[in-house]
Regions:
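Amphipathic alpha-helical scaffolding segments comprising HEAT/armadillo-like alpha-solenoid repeats
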Residues: 247-257, 279-292, 311-323, 342-353, ...
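Charge-rich, solvent-exposed alpha-helical interaction surfaces
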Residues: 23-26, 30, 272, 287, ...
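Long, contiguous interaction/recruitment modules in multidomain scaffold/adaptor proteins
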Residues: 136-252
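A short, ordered amphipathic alpha-helix with a cationic face
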Residues: 49-55, 240-244, 259
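A surface-exposed partner-binding patch
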Residues: 3-181, 296, 326, 339-346, ...
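Alpha-helical segment of the N-proximal tetratricopeptide repeat
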Residues: 242-246, 251-278
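Conserved hydrophobic register position within alpha-solenoid helical repeats
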Residues: 266-270, 299-302, 329-333, 360-364, ...
Length: 476
């Protein structure tokens, strides 16, 4: 008889609490549905695990793990690893799960540690869902202030140093069982100790503040993942950040947002809606517009959410907001409606002289470049701005012009800049410009800088090469 890949062997009910049986059965069915829904492996990380299932883990293996590390695994996680799987499958490093998949049971336990998992897995977990940034920094900074000393295991010279670093890791990441990798320095882990035991937390090895998943246990978190694969929510051009935001339907979240006065809950609801797959249904956009008209403290964020799905519906609200908050409006247009940059060129030209915010100026120049083929004359005055960051952006923008060589006098002025960061941007902007009038100024720069301050010399070197010179030759 052929074994169905997605037909796990369910252990007798007496081996785990009966409350999990129905949910495990749903998960069993949804694994097959998820694989079918994502047959082209479009969900981020799915091409790595391919919805593979390892054989279920035996009770003896679970007990041996708990004894080795001195921990008690959450009941629902125990039920999962002992139930969900393909008894005839090969055991691989990962199996079906969020991002790059779930680690095979009992593996990668040191992912958040230098070593010493026998000590650290049973250590008290110091993390909490409501931890502030200040609390996180107070916990993590003192323990990793010398983290560069431990980047390479071969650099650890003494047993004392190893033990100290293990202790530091244990204080920050103690009580966490790594479940899988999200790529780069991000992981999801199962809390084993403390008041939040059983919860899933997203952690970052570069010490960004941890983010707890909203589900209160492993099975709910895993089933939510399968639901989002099946619904297509995770099949998206955008990075979906599963497990970081509330997963209920957008309609449910907006309804809760309307009927609660708790600010954190309101923020969580809108963040959840923001990360839904686009475009949102027209009825949801109607509700968002209604909320915008209430002019509450979330108005700007609601306009952003609307902008993601419908530029035409968002446009009147963007027009109302642009004079007061050009930075936000220019960002929204650039991020969500680049095809409509030309609509905003007159507004940008009108507001640009009064913009002092550096980020707002950056986004204004993006809209100009995209929406106006003759943006250069608008940008020229800002090469003399008192703010060096504004000057940098002005030269960078001018460097994107197809008519750069018509503005050689402006670039020559820039090559005499006192601010090295601005100067570097001017040099970069002259890529492939080989006019001999530039050479005397390039030589002056070569003599002026003995060291590669802000990569001046690194960028100057290929410019001099246009004229057959090296840095040393230019200094003569």
């Amino acid at each position: 008889m052929e074994i169905d890949f997605f037909m796990p062997n369910i252990l007798p009910p007496k081996t785990f609490p009966s409350m999990y049986q129905e949910q495990l059965h749903r998960i069993q069915q949804k694994l097959a549905q998820a694989k079918a829904a994502d047959k082209d492996l479009e969900v981020f990380g799915a091409s790595s695990h391919k919805y593979h299932l390892n054989p279920p883990v035996s009770e003896a293996e679970v007990l041996a793990f708990e004894e080795k590390y001195g921990v008690s695994l959450p009941d629902d996680y125990r039920a999962f690893v002992q139930t969900i799987g393909d008894a005839n499958a090969q055991k691989l490093d990962t199996m079906a799960g969020p991002y790059y998949g779930l680690y095979a049971f009992g593996t990668q336990v040191n992912d958040l540690l230098y070593k010493g998992s026998e000590t650290c897995l049973k250590a008290p977990c110091a993390l909490s869902p409501d931890m502030t940034q200040e609390e996180w920094e107070a916990l993590s900074d003192p323990h990793f202030e010398d983290e560069d000393d431990f980047e390479d295991e071969e650099e650890v010279e003494t047993t004392e140093t190893e033990e100290e670093y293990t202790r530091q890791c244990g204080k920050v990441f103690g009580g966490l069982l790594p479940l899988g990798s999200q790529g780069c320095a991000d992981y999801h882990a199962l809390v084993l100790t403390g008041p939040y035991a059983g919860r899933i937390v997203n952690v970052n090895w570069d010490l960004l503040k941890p983010v707890f998943a909203f589900e209160t246990n492993f099975l709910d978190w895993y089933e939510h993942y399968l639901d989002e694969v099946i619904s297509g929510q995770l099949i998206d051009d955008r990075f979906t950040w599963f497990g970081y935001y509330r997963g209920e339907a957008a309609e449910v979240l907006l309804n809760e947002y309307e009927h609660t006065t708790d600010r954190k809950t309101q923020t969580d609801c809108l963040e959840g809606v923001y990360h839904k797959k686009l475009p949102l249904e027209p009825a949801l956009l109607d509700k968002i517009e209604k909320l915008i008209t209430l002019n509450n403290e979330d108005r700007d964020f609601l306009i952003e959410i609307l902008s993601q799905s419908s530029y035409e519906r968002a446009k009147p609200y963007l027009q109302d907001l642009v004079t007061e908050k050009p930075n936000k409006v220019f960002r929204y247009i650039w991020w969500y409606a680049q095809d409509h940059c030309a609509d905003w060129v007159p507004v940008v030209k009108e507001l640009l002289p009064s913009i002092t915010d550096e980020e707002a100026f950056d986004f204004a120049t993006y809209l100009l470049r995209e929406g106006d083929d003759n943006f250069e004359e608008v940008i020229l005055p800002f090469t003399d701005d008192a703010n060096p960051q504004i000057r940098r952006t002005a030269y960078y923008t001018l460097g994107k012009s197809k008519k750069r060589e018509q503005y050689l006098d402006t670039f020559i002025k820039g090559l005499q800049e006192s601010d090295s960061k601005v100067l570097n941007k001017v040099i970069q902007a002259l890529y492939k410009v080989k006019d001999k009038r530039l050479l005397p100024y390039y030589k002056q720069i070569a003599k002026r800088f003995s060291k590669d301050e802000n990569y001046i010399l690194s960028n100057l070197e290929p410019r001099l090469a246009y004229f057959g010179l090296t840095i040393e030759e230019a200094r003569k």
